[in-house]
Protein backbone atom coordinates (compact mmCIF):
# COMPACT_ATOMS: atom_id res chain seq x y z
CA UNK A 1 0.00 0.00 0.00
CA UNK A 2 1.01 3.64 -0.14
CA UNK A 3 2.52 3.66 3.34
CA UNK A 4 5.12 0.99 2.76
CA UNK A 5 5.68 2.38 -0.72
CA UNK A 6 6.74 5.59 0.99
CA UNK A 7 8.85 3.69 3.50
CA UNK A 8 10.57 1.75 0.73
CA UNK A 9 11.23 4.93 -1.24
CA UNK A 10 12.72 6.51 1.84
CA UNK A 11 14.75 3.57 3.11
CA UNK A 12 15.64 1.76 -0.08
CA UNK A 13 16.49 -1.92 -0.20
CA UNK A 14 20.06 -1.83 1.06
CA UNK A 15 21.53 -1.28 4.47
CA UNK A 16 23.75 1.48 3.05
CA UNK A 17 20.71 3.43 1.85
CA UNK A 18 19.17 3.05 5.27
CA UNK A 19 22.39 4.30 6.81
CA UNK A 20 22.25 7.34 4.52
CA UNK A 21 18.62 7.88 5.49
CA UNK A 22 19.52 7.76 9.16
CA UNK A 23 22.25 10.32 8.57
CA UNK A 24 19.71 12.57 6.88
CA UNK A 25 17.33 12.26 9.82
CA UNK A 26 20.09 12.72 12.37
CA UNK A 27 21.12 16.00 10.76
CA UNK A 28 17.66 17.49 10.89
CA UNK A 29 16.19 15.59 13.81
CA UNK A 30 15.92 17.00 17.28
CA UNK A 31 16.52 15.17 20.51
CA UNK A 32 12.76 14.55 20.49
CA UNK A 33 13.05 12.56 17.26
CA UNK A 34 15.79 10.48 18.85
CA UNK A 35 13.63 9.72 21.87
CA UNK A 36 10.65 8.91 19.63
CA UNK A 37 12.72 6.40 17.68
CA UNK A 38 14.04 5.03 20.97
CA UNK A 39 10.55 4.45 22.32
CA UNK A 40 9.18 2.79 19.18
CA UNK A 41 12.17 0.65 18.24
CA UNK A 42 12.84 0.00 21.92
CA UNK A 43 9.42 -1.62 22.20
CA UNK A 44 10.41 -4.10 19.49
CA UNK A 45 13.81 -4.82 20.99
CA UNK A 46 12.30 -5.65 24.37
CA UNK A 47 9.73 -7.83 22.64
CA UNK A 48 12.35 -9.72 20.61
CA UNK A 49 14.68 -10.20 23.58
CA UNK A 50 11.86 -11.54 25.74
CA UNK A 51 10.06 -13.72 23.20
CA UNK A 52 12.28 -16.83 23.62
CA UNK A 53 11.71 -16.90 27.39
CA UNK A 54 8.04 -15.94 27.43
CA UNK A 55 6.09 -18.32 29.71
CA UNK A 56 9.35 -19.47 31.35
CA UNK A 57 9.68 -19.53 35.12
CA UNK A 58 12.06 -16.91 36.52
CA UNK A 59 15.47 -18.47 37.04
CA UNK A 60 14.48 -21.50 34.99
CA UNK A 61 16.34 -20.46 31.82
CA UNK A 62 19.86 -19.29 30.92
CA UNK A 63 20.21 -15.55 31.47
CA UNK A 64 19.20 -13.53 28.43
CA UNK A 65 22.13 -11.39 27.27
CA UNK A 66 21.09 -10.84 23.65
CA UNK A 67 18.80 -12.08 20.92
CA UNK A 68 18.33 -15.83 20.75
CA UNK A 69 16.22 -18.25 18.77
CA UNK A 70 13.57 -20.62 20.11
CA UNK A 71 10.86 -20.25 22.68
CA UNK A 72 7.24 -21.36 22.54
CA UNK A 73 6.84 -20.01 19.00
CA UNK A 74 10.25 -21.26 17.79
CA UNK A 75 11.19 -17.86 16.41
CA UNK A 76 14.54 -16.97 14.86
CA UNK A 77 16.85 -14.70 16.84
CA UNK A 78 15.73 -11.07 16.73
CA UNK A 79 12.16 -11.86 15.70
CA UNK A 80 9.30 -10.21 17.53
CA UNK A 81 5.73 -11.11 18.42
CA UNK A 82 2.27 -9.58 18.76
CA UNK A 83 3.52 -6.64 20.81
CA UNK A 84 5.42 -5.15 17.89
CA UNK A 85 3.02 -6.36 15.20
CA UNK A 86 0.11 -4.58 16.86
CA UNK A 87 2.24 -1.48 17.42
CA UNK A 88 3.00 -1.46 13.70
CA UNK A 89 -0.70 -1.77 12.92
CA UNK A 90 -1.41 1.15 15.24
CA UNK A 91 1.37 3.25 13.75
CA UNK A 92 0.29 2.48 10.20
CA UNK A 93 -3.30 3.41 11.01
CA UNK A 94 -2.35 6.70 12.68
CA UNK A 95 -0.30 7.67 9.65
CA UNK A 96 -2.71 6.52 6.95
CA UNK A 97 -5.79 8.03 8.62
CA UNK A 98 -4.00 11.13 9.90
CA UNK A 99 -5.15 10.28 13.42
CA UNK A 100 -7.02 7.65 15.39
CA UNK A 101 -9.70 5.64 13.57
CA UNK A 102 -11.04 2.61 15.46
CA UNK A 103 -12.45 0.82 12.41
CA UNK A 104 -9.27 1.17 10.40
CA UNK A 105 -7.19 0.04 13.38
CA UNK A 106 -9.31 -3.06 13.95
CA UNK A 107 -9.14 -3.90 10.25
CA UNK A 108 -5.36 -3.78 10.47
CA UNK A 109 -5.38 -5.91 13.62
CA UNK A 110 -7.54 -8.42 11.74
CA UNK A 111 -5.11 -8.44 8.82
CA UNK A 112 -2.31 -9.19 11.25
CA UNK A 113 -4.21 -11.99 12.98
CA UNK A 114 -5.67 -13.64 9.88
CA UNK A 115 -3.01 -13.04 7.24
CA UNK A 116 0.22 -12.42 9.12
CA UNK A 117 0.49 -8.79 8.07
CA UNK A 118 3.04 -6.69 9.98
CA UNK A 119 4.72 -9.75 11.47
CA UNK A 120 8.41 -10.64 11.69
CA UNK A 121 7.98 -14.12 10.21
CA UNK A 122 4.82 -13.96 8.08
CA UNK A 123 2.74 -15.67 10.76
CA UNK A 124 0.89 -14.02 13.64
CA UNK A 125 1.90 -15.31 17.07
CA UNK A 126 1.07 -14.51 20.66
CA UNK A 127 -2.42 -13.07 20.35
CA UNK A 128 -4.06 -12.51 23.74
CA UNK A 129 -7.53 -13.70 24.66
CA UNK A 130 -8.99 -10.20 25.00
CA UNK A 131 -7.76 -9.26 21.55
CA UNK A 132 -8.89 -12.53 20.03
CA UNK A 133 -12.42 -12.15 21.39
CA UNK A 134 -12.64 -8.51 20.35
CA UNK A 135 -11.48 -9.17 16.80
CA UNK A 136 -14.01 -11.99 16.58
CA UNK A 137 -16.75 -9.54 17.53
CA UNK A 138 -15.45 -6.99 15.04
CA UNK A 139 -15.49 -9.52 12.20
CA UNK A 140 -18.98 -10.74 13.09
CA UNK A 141 -20.81 -7.48 13.73
CA UNK A 142 -18.44 -4.55 13.36
CA UNK A 143 -18.04 -3.87 17.09
CA UNK A 144 -15.52 -1.05 17.55
CA UNK A 145 -15.28 -1.04 21.35
CA UNK A 146 -14.36 -4.12 23.35
CA UNK A 147 -17.05 -5.74 25.48
CA UNK A 148 -16.40 -7.26 28.89
CA UNK A 149 -16.01 -11.01 28.95
CA UNK A 150 -16.08 -12.62 32.38
CA UNK A 151 -13.50 -11.33 34.84
CA UNK A 152 -10.35 -11.48 32.69
CA UNK A 153 -10.25 -8.13 30.93
CA UNK A 154 -7.20 -6.58 32.58
CA UNK A 155 -4.52 -7.98 30.30
CA UNK A 156 -1.52 -6.00 29.07
CA UNK A 157 -2.28 -6.16 25.34
CA UNK A 158 -3.18 -2.51 24.92
CA UNK A 159 -0.25 -1.29 27.03
CA UNK A 160 2.37 -3.20 25.08
CA UNK A 161 1.58 -1.47 21.77
CA UNK A 162 1.22 2.08 23.07
CA UNK A 163 4.33 3.86 21.73
CA UNK A 164 2.88 5.02 18.35
CA UNK A 165 0.22 7.08 20.11
CA UNK A 166 2.86 8.82 22.20
CA UNK A 167 5.10 9.40 19.19
CA UNK A 168 2.19 11.16 17.46
CA UNK A 169 0.75 13.19 20.33
CA UNK A 170 3.55 13.69 22.88
CA UNK A 171 3.30 17.48 22.58
CA UNK A 172 -0.37 17.53 23.65
CA UNK A 173 -0.63 16.00 27.13
CA UNK A 174 -4.43 15.92 27.16
CA UNK A 175 -4.79 14.40 23.71
CA UNK A 176 -2.12 11.79 24.28
CA UNK A 177 -4.12 10.48 27.24
CA UNK A 178 -7.36 10.53 25.24
CA UNK A 179 -5.79 8.62 22.36
CA UNK A 180 -4.12 6.15 24.72
CA UNK A 181 -7.54 5.43 26.19
CA UNK A 182 -9.24 5.19 22.80
CA UNK A 183 -6.78 2.67 21.37
CA UNK A 184 -6.98 0.61 24.56
CA UNK A 185 -10.78 0.41 24.42
CA UNK A 186 -10.73 -1.18 20.97
CA UNK A 187 -9.52 -4.47 22.47
CA UNK A 188 -9.73 -4.21 26.26
CA UNK A 189 -12.95 -3.45 28.15
CA UNK A 190 -11.04 -2.52 31.27
CA UNK A 191 -10.84 0.69 33.27
CA UNK A 192 -7.58 -0.55 34.77
CA UNK A 193 -5.93 -1.21 31.39
CA UNK A 194 -7.26 2.15 30.17
CA UNK A 195 -5.77 3.98 33.14
CA UNK A 196 -2.42 2.21 32.85
CA UNK A 197 -2.25 3.25 29.20
CA UNK A 198 -3.09 6.84 30.10
CA UNK A 199 -0.41 6.88 32.78
CA UNK A 200 2.28 5.39 30.56
CA UNK A 201 1.35 7.76 27.73
CA UNK A 202 1.61 10.75 30.05
CA UNK A 203 4.95 9.57 31.39
CA UNK A 204 6.51 8.91 28.01
CA UNK A 205 5.08 12.09 26.46
CA UNK A 206 6.68 14.21 29.14
CA UNK A 207 10.03 12.46 28.78
CA UNK A 208 10.01 12.69 24.97
CA UNK A 209 9.07 16.35 25.30
CA UNK A 210 12.18 17.03 27.36
CA UNK A 211 11.25 16.55 31.03
CA UNK A 212 13.47 14.36 33.14
CA UNK A 213 12.05 10.96 33.97
CA UNK A 214 12.07 11.84 37.67
CA UNK A 215 10.14 15.07 37.15
CA UNK A 216 7.62 13.35 34.90
CA UNK A 217 7.00 10.65 37.51
CA UNK A 218 6.64 13.25 40.25
CA UNK A 219 4.20 15.35 38.23
CA UNK A 220 2.01 12.37 37.41
CA UNK A 221 2.00 11.19 41.01
CA UNK A 222 0.06 14.33 41.92
CA UNK A 223 -2.84 13.37 39.63
CA UNK A 224 -5.77 11.20 40.71
CA UNK A 225 -5.51 7.53 39.77
CA UNK A 226 -7.38 4.40 40.77
CA UNK A 227 -6.05 2.14 43.53
CA UNK A 228 -4.28 -0.60 41.56
CA UNK A 229 -2.34 1.94 39.52
CA UNK A 230 -1.70 4.30 42.43
CA UNK A 231 -0.01 1.46 44.28
CA UNK A 232 2.41 1.14 41.35
CA UNK A 233 3.00 4.89 41.16
CA UNK A 234 3.76 5.17 44.88
CA UNK A 235 5.93 2.04 44.98
CA UNK A 236 9.60 2.55 45.84
CA UNK A 237 10.89 0.57 42.89
CA UNK A 238 14.56 1.12 43.62
CA UNK A 239 14.15 -0.46 47.04
CA UNK A 240 12.06 -3.39 45.81
CA UNK A 241 13.73 -6.78 45.57
CA UNK A 242 13.34 -8.77 42.37
CA UNK A 243 11.43 -11.41 44.33
CA UNK A 244 8.73 -8.81 45.03
CA UNK A 245 8.18 -8.06 41.33
CA UNK A 246 5.51 -9.98 39.42
CA UNK A 247 5.88 -10.23 35.65
CA UNK A 248 2.49 -11.68 34.78
CA UNK A 249 0.14 -10.66 31.97
CA UNK A 250 -1.96 -8.59 34.37
CA UNK A 251 -1.54 -5.03 33.12
CA UNK A 252 -0.68 -3.61 36.56
CA UNK A 253 2.01 -6.25 37.12
CA UNK A 254 3.47 -5.56 33.68
CA UNK A 255 3.67 -1.81 34.21
CA UNK A 256 5.14 -2.22 37.68
CA UNK A 257 7.76 -4.71 36.46
CA UNK A 258 8.77 -2.47 33.55
CA UNK A 259 9.19 0.56 35.80
CA UNK A 260 11.18 -1.54 38.28
CA UNK A 261 13.53 -2.67 35.50
CA UNK A 262 14.03 0.87 34.23
CA UNK A 263 14.63 2.37 37.67
CA UNK A 264 17.11 -0.33 38.63
CA UNK A 265 19.35 0.09 35.59
CA UNK A 266 21.50 2.82 34.06
CA UNK A 267 21.11 2.20 30.32
CA UNK A 268 18.62 1.13 27.69
CA UNK A 269 20.21 -2.29 27.31
CA UNK A 270 20.38 -2.79 31.05
CA UNK A 271 16.69 -1.98 31.44
CA UNK A 272 15.38 -4.32 28.75
CA UNK A 273 17.62 -7.20 29.82
CA UNK A 274 16.57 -6.79 33.44
CA UNK A 275 12.94 -6.80 32.31
CA UNK A 276 13.04 -9.91 30.13
CA UNK A 277 15.03 -11.92 32.65
CA UNK A 278 12.03 -11.69 34.98
CA UNK A 279 10.47 -14.40 32.81
CA UNK A 280 6.75 -15.18 32.62
CA UNK A 281 5.26 -12.56 30.24
CA UNK A 282 8.81 -11.59 29.40
CA UNK A 283 8.25 -10.21 25.91
CA UNK A 284 5.59 -7.75 27.01
CA UNK A 285 7.41 -6.64 30.15
CA UNK A 286 10.41 -6.17 27.87
CA UNK A 287 8.33 -4.24 25.34
CA UNK A 288 6.97 -1.84 27.97
CA UNK A 289 10.39 -1.38 29.55
CA UNK A 290 11.81 -0.82 26.08
CA UNK A 291 9.32 1.95 25.39
CA UNK A 292 10.14 3.75 28.63
CA UNK A 293 13.90 3.26 28.44
CA UNK A 294 13.94 4.18 24.76
CA UNK A 295 12.16 7.43 25.54
CA UNK A 296 14.65 8.19 28.32
CA UNK A 297 17.93 7.28 26.62
CA UNK A 298 17.02 7.73 22.94
CA UNK A 299 17.70 5.64 19.88
CA UNK A 300 21.26 6.92 19.59
CA UNK A 301 22.14 5.27 22.91
CA UNK A 302 21.04 1.79 21.81
CA UNK A 303 24.01 -0.52 21.18
CA UNK A 304 24.68 -1.34 17.53
CA UNK A 305 24.32 -5.07 18.07
CA UNK A 306 20.73 -4.64 19.24
CA UNK A 307 19.93 -2.63 16.12
CA UNK A 308 21.71 -4.99 13.74
CA UNK A 309 20.11 -8.14 15.16
CA UNK A 310 16.49 -6.95 15.20
CA UNK A 311 14.27 -8.27 12.40
CA UNK A 312 13.03 -5.43 10.17
CA UNK A 313 14.82 -2.82 12.26
CA UNK A 314 14.98 -0.47 9.28
CA UNK A 315 11.22 -0.52 8.82
CA UNK A 316 10.64 0.05 12.51
CA UNK A 317 13.01 3.00 12.65
CA UNK A 318 11.54 4.68 9.57
CA UNK A 319 8.00 4.10 10.80
CA UNK A 320 8.86 5.93 14.01
CA UNK A 321 9.99 8.92 11.98
CA UNK A 322 6.87 8.92 9.80
CA UNK A 323 4.89 9.25 13.02
CA UNK A 324 6.53 12.61 13.63
CA UNK A 325 5.64 14.14 10.25
Label for each model-derived stretch:
Residues 1-325:
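Structured, active/binding-site neighborhoods that engage oxygen-rich ligands
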Amino acid sequence: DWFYGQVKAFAGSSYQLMSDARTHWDRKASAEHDRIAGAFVGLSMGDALGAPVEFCRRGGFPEVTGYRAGGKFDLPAGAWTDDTAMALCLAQSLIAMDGFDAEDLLQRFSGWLEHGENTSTGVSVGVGQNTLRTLGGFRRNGTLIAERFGSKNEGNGSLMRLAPVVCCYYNDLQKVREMASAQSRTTHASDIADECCQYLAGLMARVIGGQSYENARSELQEAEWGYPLMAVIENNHKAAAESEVKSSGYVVDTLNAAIWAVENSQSFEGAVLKAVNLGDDADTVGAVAGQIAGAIYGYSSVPKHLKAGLVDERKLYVTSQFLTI
